[in-house]
């Protein structure tokens, strides 16, 4: 059974910051708190439109993290150049559409083997470990192994979005089968997308799982669990000002 790690995605700390164009909340501070709480790594997605994480965030995080940095990115010349310069510990190559709210599916590795092979080699030559974000599909898993990626990250969105227990069980079985197949090819298996406090345990129980990358659910829970203290502190400061 693989050691199970947690990668915390802090993109939506940056989303909240950018909504008002302020310097807070700071993703770097959030990363530090996550590490102190037990995160094994920090994940950020530098999108082409820079809708949340910025180039500056990436540079500072790379310099300050105590754990590992996982940079999610599209396979473009701009992003590859940034990765080679920044040298995160990991790069997860994801498909990207400007109009999407969040990543909608896995990378089509089988349909673009040469492009993915070149990207994997370029990143590996820079000392970066590569993961390919793919659906739980044997053809894509075989292609990932063929292009030289040591890791895959299985897209768990269909599992997370399942409308019925039967549908969710079917998706879980598909993910578990894919994880076993990937491990048989020598790939290390990560997973992520849509995982929450209610659905994570079944995925975590899959023996081949190495790391789960979770962000939105954790940030959403943090807002609720921290709201009481935040309101109380503001009220205390106001009353102190009146003596």
Curated annotation (Swiss-Prot):
Coiled coil: none annotated. It catalyses: 3-amino-2-oxopropyl phosphate + 1-deoxy-D-xylulose 5-phosphate = pyridoxine 5'-phosphate + phosphate + 2 H2O + H(+). Keywords: Cytoplasm, Pyridoxine biosynthesis, Transferase. InterPro entries: Aldolase_TIM, PyrdxlP_synth_PdxJ, Pyridoxine-5'_phos_synth. The active site is at 45 (proton acceptor), 72 (proton acceptor), 193 (proton donor). Its EC number is 2.6.99.2. GO terms for biological process: pyridoxine biosynthetic process. 1-deoxy-D-xylulose 5-phosphate binds at residues 11-12, 47, 52, 102. The record marks 153 as: Transition state stabilizer. Pathway: Cofactor biosynthesis; pyridoxine 5'-phosphate biosynthesis; pyridoxine 5'-phosphate from D-erythrose 4-phosphate: step 5/5. GO terms for cellular component: cytosol. Its main location: cytoplasm. Catalyzes the complicated ring closure reaction between the two acyclic compounds 1-deoxy-D-xylulose-5-phosphate (DXP) and 3-amino-2-oxopropyl phosphate (1-amino-acetone-3-phosphate or AAP) to form pyridoxine 5'-phosphate (PNP) and inorganic phosphate. This is Pyridoxine 5'-phosphate synthase. It comes from Shigella dysenteriae serotype 1 (strain Sd197). The lineage of its organism: Bacteria, Pseudomonadati, Pseudomonadota, Gammaproteobacteria, Enterobacterales. The gene is pdxJ.
């Amino acid at each position: 059974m693989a050691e199970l790690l947690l990668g915390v995605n802090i993109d939506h700390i940056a989303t909240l910051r950018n909504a008002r164009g302020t310097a807070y909340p700071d993703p770097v501070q959030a990363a530090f708190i996550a590490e102190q709480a037990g995160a094994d790594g920090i994940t950020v997605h530098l999108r082409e439109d820079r809708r949340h994480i910025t180039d500056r965030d990436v540079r500072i995080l790379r310099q300050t993290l105590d754990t590992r940095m996982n940079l999610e990115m599209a396979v473009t010349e701009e992003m590859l150049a940034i990765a080679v310069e920044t040298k995160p510990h990991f790069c997860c190559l994801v498909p990207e559409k400007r109009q999407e709210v969040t990543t909608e599916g896995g990378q089509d590795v089988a349909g673009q083997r040469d492009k993915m092979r070149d990207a994997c080699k370029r990143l590996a030559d820079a000392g970066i470990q590569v993961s390919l974000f793919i659906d739980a599909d044997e053809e894509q898993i075989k292609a990932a192994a063929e292009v030289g990626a040591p890791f895959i990250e299985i897209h768990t969105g269909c599992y997370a979005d399942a409308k019925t227990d039967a549908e969710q069980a079917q998706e879980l079985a598909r993910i578990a089968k894919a994880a076993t197949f990937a491990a048989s090819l020598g790939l290390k298996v990560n997973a992520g997308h849509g995982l929450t406090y209610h659905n994570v345990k079944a995925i975590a129980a899959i023996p081949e799982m190495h790391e789960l990358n979770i962000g939105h659910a954790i940030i959403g829970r943090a807002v609720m669990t921290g709201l009481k203290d935040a309101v109380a502190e503001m009220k205390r400061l106001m009353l102190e000002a009146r003596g």
